[in-house]
Amino acid sequence: MMFKQYLQVTKPGIIFGNLISVIGGFLLASKGSIDYPLFIYTLVGVSLVVASGCVFNNYIDRDIDRKMERTKNRVLVKGLISPGVSLVYATLLGIAGFMLLWFGANPLACWLGVMGFVVYVGVYSLYMKRHSVYGTLIGSLSGAAPPVIGYCAVTGDFDSGAAILLAIFSLWQMPHSYAIAIFRFKDYQAANIPVLPVVKGISVAKNHITLYIIAFAVATLMLTLGGYAGYKYLVVAAAVSVWWLGMALRGYKVEDDKVWARKLFGFSIIAITALSIMMSVDFMVPNSQNLLTYVW
């Protein structure tokens, strides 16, 4: 029973979602030549770091979690694990994760993990989430760290491919998170969390969602234009972006914003999973010509 509680406080759903993106970044950089020990070290290392961040987040958010229907039954809110024990647990998870990334992958992968962790726990959870409408934007940077860690674990270098991945996953986070804030509007309002839909209104949030999806669509295409992913990836990226944008535009005419937002959120998961899979299997081999070559 205790094992279940210690697992729940790490938010396994978030860990699983991040692992999909780590695999995407790792296999994109591997280009068919997979170092399996490095692969395992990277996956386990990122999992532990993400788990640590989630436990710290649960500790920090104990007060506001009590006010939200979605989170009122979390382990720390119900007192199933003491706050002190959770801090020790989170610290041990983090140390183990960072050590695996440093010694099993490379220092760059570890430092990227540290930066993502600091942004999520130190900047987003401790301050921005509670005090600024820009909290989601800051948090998106930490959410984009896992695929970049996977990529840089292989390359050992933060190149344009890593920058494109950072852009794709950061931009994806915004409409994904705003959709959650719309269909969980009352929860965020009750907890006094200044997310965009609550502070500026749902209509403004819809405008932001549309603009971020357009920016996301452009960013996804850059992997092929830059010579990192193939044309099958390009087709899938274009298709999911157009469909997601269409869903966003239909939001201006819907009668039930919550139902629409849930559908938009659901498709965001499908979209990022599809892209992660496609970049894993449809990569460009070294020295391949890319479309930007013909432009210049």
From Swiss-Prot:
This protein's name: Protoheme IX farnesyltransferase
Cell location: Cell inner membrane
InterPro entries: Protohaem_IX_farnesylTrfase, UbiA_prenyltransferase, UbiA_prenylTrfase_CS, UbiA_sf
Taxonomic superkingdom: Bacteria
Pathway where this protein functions: Porphyrin-containing compound metabolism; heme O biosynthesis; heme O from protoheme: step 1/1
Leftover remarks: Carbon 2 of the heme B porphyrin ring is defined according to the Fischer nomenclature.
Membrane topology qualifier: Multi-pass membrane protein
